[in-house]
UniProtKB/Swiss-Prot annotation:
Keywords: Acyltransferase, Amino-acid biosynthesis, Diaminopimelate biosynthesis, Lysine biosynthesis, Repeat, Transferase. The keyword Transferase applies. Transmembrane segments: none annotated. It comes from Listeria welshimeri serovar 6b (strain ATCC 35897 / DSM 20650 / CCUG 15529 / CIP 8149 / NCTC 11857 / SLCC 5334 / V8). The gene is dapH. Its EC number is 2.3.1.89. SUPFAM superfamilies: Trimeric LpxA-like enzymes (SSF51161). Catalyzes the transfer of an acetyl group from acetyl-CoA to tetrahydrodipicolinate. Belongs to the transferase hexapeptide repeat family. DapH subfamily. It catalyses: (S)-2,3,4,5-tetrahydrodipicolinate + acetyl-CoA + H2O = L-2-acetamido-6-oxoheptanedioate + CoA. Gene3D superfamilies: Hexapeptide repeat proteins (2.160.10.10), Malonyl-CoA ACP transacylase, ACP-binding (3.30.70.250). Pathway: Amino-acid biosynthesis; L-lysine biosynthesis via DAP pathway; LL-2,6-diaminopimelate from (S)-tetrahydrodipicolinate (acetylase route): step 1/3. This is 2,3,4,5-tetrahydropyridine-2,6-dicarboxylate N-acetyltransferase.
Length: 236
């Protein structure tokens, strides 16, 4: 999938059909209810479950109060513009609780851990691990064989469209609870220490730390050993 630019994302959101889907468990004299074709029904006898848009389901429930003994509604969004990514055929390990929106590219053997939030237009390279509770903003790009530590935030940009998103090149290790501001590029093989706030570009093969992040040294054998990417964790 080709990465979307900001104007394409804005157009996608603007033109998308906004959705408020609901799931309703109900019981009663359901055979007397004429369910419209755009409501999916899974009903046996006097109980069942229906799925549909709230704009359709709400008047249906109201019009059939006499035939419905009780019901419970589940709803997790309102006028949502972007659906979640269909993950069934992605060649990656994606753990429960990750929230990944549509139009995200995920490379082969990538790992997305619990609680990660990945916004529209983001790109995750082959073999990259996105750890727990990481946030990838819109259009944020992470290269191959990287590790983005738990709780880190890579700023994304949809508006203003002229701004640039974060770009992380290949073989980068980002520690836990790092914040990388919009427009920053982290060069290949760099290491960002935990808790850093990265406000400017990071040169390839360097180690940075602090608030704001500053270069400490060039990547050496000791640091490389401590930040080794384990391919065993990426096998499917």
């Amino acid at each position: 999938m080709e990465q979307m630019d900001a104007h394409q994302i804005i157009s996608f959101i603007q033109n998308s059909k906004k959705a408020t889907p609901v799931k309703v468990y109900l019981k009663g004299d359901l055979e007397k209810i004429d369910f419209p074709s755009d409501v999916k029904t899974f009903i046996t006898g006097n109980a069942g479950t229906i799925f549909g848009e709230w704009a359709v389901v709400e008047p249906l429930l109201e019009a059939n109060k006499a035939n419905i003994e009780d019901y419970v509604i589940e709803n997790d969004r309102r006028n949502s513009a972007i659906p979640l990514l269909d993950m069934k055929n992605i060649n990656a390990r994606i753990e429960p609780g990750a929230v990944i929106r549509d139009q995200v590219t995920i490379g082969d053997n990538a790992v997305i851990m619990m609680g990660a939030s990945i916004n529209i237009g983001s790109v995750i390279g082959d073999g990259t691990m996105i750890d727990m509770n990481v946030v990838l903003g819109g259009r944020a790009t992470v290269g191959k064989n990287c590790h983005i530590g738990a709780g880190s935030v890579l700023a994304g940009v949809v508006e203003p469209p002229s701004a640039q998103p974060v770009i992380v090149e290949d073989n980068v290790v980002v520690g836990a609870n790092v914040v990388v501001l919009e427009g920053v590029r982290i060069g290949e093989g760099a290491v960002v220490a935990a808790g850093a706030i990265v406000t400017k570009d990071v040169a390839p093969g360097t180690v940075v730390a602090g608030i704001p992040a500053r270069e400490l040294k060039k990547l050496d054998a000791k640091t490389a050993s401590k930040t080794e990417i384990m391919q065993e964790l990426r096998q499917l």
